[in-house]
Amino acid sequence: MIVKAVRVKMRTNDITAAALADTMSRFNAACNALSQTAWETQTFRAFDLHKVAYHHTRVEFSLPAQLTVRAIAKVCDTYKTDRSQCHTFGPRGAVVFDARCFKMKGVSSAFLTTTQGRHLFSLAHGGKQREQLSQGTTGEADLLFVDGNYYLSIAVKFPDPPKADTSGGVLGVDMGIVELATDSEGQSFSGAVVKAVRCRVREHRRQVQKKRSRSAFKRLQKINRRASRFTRDVNHCISKSLVLKAKVLQKALALEDLSGIRERASGFNKTMRWQMGNWAFADLAAKIVYKAAEAGLPVVFVDPRNTSRTCSVCGHCDKANRKSQASFQCLSCGFCANADKNAAKNIEARAELSDSLMFRSNPALFA
């Protein structure tokens, strides 16, 4: 089963907009209260927190029953990945609706349960969104507020496609900062444009932050969203190209398991830490995984250790083999190649040694 998030804009009037605003405000206030209770009592399972706080929360915040249940689930989900501190939620945080409080009517409208009753909302979407909503099965939805507009991010389920032919072997993909991705066939996707945009955004952000006003804060949020959209678009193009290439070559895809890499970069200098912090490898990997799943291609994750130091011809591993960021020369056999292509070859070889090629994704990539 493939699940995709389809975002559509909601058409509202004064009455329905007020209902959504009130629902969002109460829902997130309830999440904050529930989070405080969960933290103080160390109650992080939804079943246990429900018994402790459901009735009190529903009465205090005047939430419908199912929205109270969803607030409990949202709070507990945040503690699944981080229990080191008490979590807080902004007044415009996403509101989660499931099948009991959200229902599509065709593909152009949806019913939502709010604090002011059940309302029917008209949805504004394009041809691609209409196609996805009509072909898949809708699940839960998130209510979002972005730049003064309300959106629904709807989870749409699609059946698994037939498995593609992978008799051609494996296409290894090395991900990096200078070259965002390099495959074992030698094709690279430069990160120069992304780096230039990030540098411009960082300087712009510095100028805006100096003003310290509410309008500057809103401007800063807009800048961050724009930079994020640009990065996601670049990753979309790269992942689409790689999956299409693998499909044509009848190959499976192999990626590095880079979970925890930012924590290991804590000893780097300030510039390198900034680059690592802005490296959207998880987004690229996630896009490759879901696009490969849509194409019926398996993806395998391999151990990334020493892929850039090991010769893909003779297997000799030495830090000195890596002459520079872009250059690799084996001290044992003299093999010379682009360092990223050599690493991609090693990733390919490790994947081929795996017991089996399965549809696999690393949960840590999406944390």
Regions found by a protein language model. Give the residues of each.
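Nucleic-acid substrate recognition interfaces
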Residues: 1-367
